[in-house]
Amino acid sequence: MKKTITFFSAPKPFTNPHIAMIQRNAIKSWTLLEDVEVILLGNESGIAEVAKEFGVKHFPNVKTNESGTPLISSMFEIARENSNSDFLCIINSDMILMDDFVEVARRSRLQCDKFVLLSQRWDYDIASPIDFANGWQSQLRETVRKQNQLHRPAGSDFFLFPKSCY
């Protein structure tokens, strides 16, 4: 079944408990979006287990540089070959997304055929796992707004674009 967006990311190892919790919160938020699929890339510790737990695709054999950093070209190649969606979105594995994300992607397509979508993020240090029960999005939005920590515009945490482009 064709999806709207394929998210793909190369998470850090899940060995540091705080980083693991942040990444798990983010990946879980992606899986709750309507009409998306998720691809996790790399063979870092814990990725295979998290992919299995959340029911997402996992491709461990992404090419890396000498330092072990995944190559963007390899990430894009794997995502293109293994996605079934109109849009691709390379995303940092600490970005929590909410349900308006998919709608913005769909509306962007109505504006023009070729585009790259990115945005400014709100910084928020999450100290515990998110309870993804009903109402989690409105509760998180309110908490984040109270902190009022809008990240400077230079952050590049995701790039969403039509699969047919770039």
Name each model feature, range by range.
Residues M1-I27:
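N-proximal low-complexity "stem/linker" segments adjacent to membrane-targeting elements
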Residues L40-I91, M98-D99:
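Active-site-proximal specificity loops/subdomain of glycosyltransferases
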